[in-house]
Regions:
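Helix-biased detector of long, well-ordered alpha-helical tracts
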Residues: 1-200
Length: 200
């Protein structure tokens, strides 16, 4: 059986890695004038629309566990987490910046898998990847996400704007993510016990 090649990040360098990961992320939103590959992104929302900006961070060991969370799924989740804040304010997410803190345990191939999930979610939601940064991390994988979106300023809603008798809607199954996490954590403990059995 042929062993998969593991490419260390040092072999391609920071800029080579960025080029490799952002290849194929062509801007689709009309408000994106310049995307990844320059010193800064350039965006121009439609006239009269407000720009919304939101930042999220995902930390290995806190927000996800790579023992049971595939990198492709993590990439998808990261985009969804970032976009949801923009959507919650009744705006359309249009651009995303992703900054990574990468530990030495991850290879170029692992990061490509992460970016496959990011690309899928961006295409699905019509979001352009317009930039980011990559640095070494001593504490595991760290994702920093900045989402931009736009909406007519009079249509933007905020948490503080809710009033009595307003209709409040939720989507998805309440508690399902928590229950799934509990099951995964249980399976992780079972696997650890099987891996390191104690003699009785």
């Amino acid at each position: 059986m042929e062993k998969k090649r593991r490419t260390e990040i040092a072999e391609v360098g920071e800029f080579g890695l960025i080029d490799l990961l952002t290849k194929g992320f062509d801007p689709a939103d009309a408000s994106t004038l310049r995307a990844a590959g320059d010193d800064a992104a350039v965006v121009m929302p439609p006239s009269g629309e407000a720009v919304l900006c939101s930042t999220d961070a995902l930390l290995e060991g806190i927000d996800f566990d790579l023992t049971y969370f595939p990198l492709r799924h993590l990439g998808y989740k990261a985009v969804t987490v970032a976009a949801s804040d923009i959507l919650a304010m009744n705006a359309l997410p249009s651009q995303l910046m992703v900054s990574l803190g990468v530990s030495s345990k991850l290879s170029v191939e692992a990061l490509q898998e992460l970016y496959e999930g990011i690309a899928f979610a961006c295409r699905e939601q019509g979001i352009d990847l317009v930039g980011g940064d990559t640095k070494a991390s001593m504490t595991g994988l760290v994702l920093g996400l900045t989402a931009l979106g736009h909406a007519p300023k009079e249509k933007v809603v905020s948490r503080g704007g809710a009033q009595q008798n307003d209709l409040i809607c939720i989507s998805g199954n309440l508690g399902a993510a928590y229950m799934g996490l509990r099951l995964l954590e249980r399976e992780k403990r079972v696997l650890a016990d099987v891996k390191d059995p104690e003699p009785k």
